[in-house]
Amino acid sequence: SQEKHHTSAFDINYFKGNIALHNPSILHLITGHPEGFIFSYNIKTFGYNEWERQYNYPDYGVSFAYQNLKNDVLGNNYSLYGHYNFYFLKRNLMFRIGQGLALNTNPYDKESNYRNNAFGSKILSATYIMLNYKKEHLFGHFGVQTGFSLLHYSNGNVKAPNTSINSLTLNLGVTYNLDEKEPKYILLDSSDIHKAYKEPIKYNLVLRSGINESDVVGSGQYPFYVVSAYVDKRINRKSALQLGTDVFFSNFLKEYIYYRSVSFPEEPTTGEEDYKRVGLFVGHELFVNKMSLVTQLGYYVYYPFDFEGKTYIRIGLKRYFGKKWFGALTLKSHAAKAEAVEFGVGVRL
């Protein structure tokens, strides 16, 4: 019979904790200790692909979570994620990161639920991270894991209000491995480590779009467009450095400039200011198989209207389709204030 290259495992975790007071405006929403469960399916790797050896044999999989936020105004969240598990300290310590979407049962409504300033929409972006001690096969197929879990929900300013919610929790879980016996790990050999990995400088062009709204509730959702051009240099198997420029066409800002000029006549805003912005950025890309994690730090060099400061951050995921084309899902923010969730399509030449 053919030797298996992967095995599967389930885990189910109960969690309970606190909502972090990251903004005084959500104080009225913190009334109890939120709790819930996370159910996950994991595919375990054993080094049959090179990226698995480079990252110390991670798992990848899907998770479903239910969270009771212990406040009728906030409602409950049901979420679905894709996740990776990374292992440290002889595989006793697991770090998991999951990204997906959540459904909120009681979002903001100006008449029936005006106190929910955390969630302006039913669909939210959801992220969770877990740092757990994990011991599999303690009793046959069963094992345990326990530690900290952080759950974050936000709609990325697709619709106001969007104060978002972060929960800091403790979790306790049971693991179940479908296979009694696991394949042997293919070890990282010296040729993997010392083999130089070189690529010439690559040129990237990305078109990004989406909808968003300013923090003024009811001001309306507008489409935005971003053109990004940058060069990247792969410095090793895992990383590339980026340098480039973004041009932002944000229609919500055009509306917001007009709103400031009319509603605050004492301010210097005339309403004629250009809503376009141009930024320069440096970035890093971390490659994990066909996916990559992108982090960028930018500075506006063309900034006619003062909106949330001159520096911006972009963080998100890319998925490559073949050698040249990729899709991207990114969050652009000014420090901790989200501006937009961007859907992008790009080419790397």
Task: Give residue ranges: language-model regions.
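Outer-membrane beta-barrel translocator/channel fold
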Residues: 8-28, 48-54, 74, 89-142, ...
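Residues on the lipid-exposed face of transmembrane beta-strands in outer-membrane beta-barrel proteins
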Residues: 12, 39-43, 80-86, 97-101, ...
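Repeated loop/turn-to-beta-strand initiation elements of outer-membrane beta-barrel proteins
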Residues: 48-50, 91-93, 137-144, 180-183, ...
